[in-house]
């Protein structure tokens, strides 16, 4: 819990530090987002699928383990 609080405080300082130097909030937020992430790229990724997405993959059973206790494989 102490670590989580410390991380939150450091994130708040990291985000608000440029504001104390005369920066605008919009510039600070834009600095947190990578340059290659644009609204056009996000929309394109939502509407267009890669060719590998259309390939039907065989269903592979997934084993779910609880506390390192796994069911036997079939």
From Swiss-Prot:
Keywords: D-amino acid, Disulfide bond, G-protein coupled receptor impairing toxin, Hydroxylation, Secreted, Signal, Toxin. The keyword Secreted applies. This peptide is an evolutionarily optimized stable analog of somatostatin. In addition, it adopts nearly identical conformations as in the somatostatin drug analog Octreotide. As this drug, it contains a D-Trp at the same position, whose synthesis is a common strategy used for enhancing the metabolic stability of compounds in drug design. Consomatins evolved by gene duplication of a 'Somatostatin and related peptides (SSRP)' gene expressed in the snail neuroendocrine system. One of its GO terms (molecular function) is toxin activity. This is Consomatin Gh1. Moderately activates human somatostatin receptors (SSTR) with a preferential activation of SSTR1 and SSTR4. In vivo, does not cause behavioral changes in mice within a few minutes of intracranial injection, but causes a progressive loss of movement thereafter. Four to five hours after injection, mice recover, even with the highest dose tested. Shows antinociception and antihyperalgesia activities in two mouse models of acute pain, most probably by acting outside the central nervous system. Belongs to the conotoxin C superfamily. Consomatin family. Expressed by the venom duct. The cysteine framework is C-C. The modification 4-hydroxyproline is found at residues 71-72, 74. Disulfide bonds join 65-70. GO terms for cellular component: extracellular region. It comes from the Eukaryota. Residues 1-22 form the signal peptide. Its main location: secreted. It is found in: Secreted. The modification D-tryptophan is found at residue 67. Residues 23-57 form a propeptide.
């Amino acid at each position: 819990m102490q670590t989580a609080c410390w991380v939150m405080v450091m994130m708040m300082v990291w985000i608000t530090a440029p504001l104390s130097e005369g920066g605008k909030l919009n510039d600070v937020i834009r600095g947190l987002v990578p340059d290659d992430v644009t609204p056009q790229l996000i929309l394109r990724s939502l509407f267009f699928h890669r060719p590998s997405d259309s390939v039907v993959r065989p269903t592979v059973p997934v084993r779910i383990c609880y506390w390192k206790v796994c069911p036997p494989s079939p």
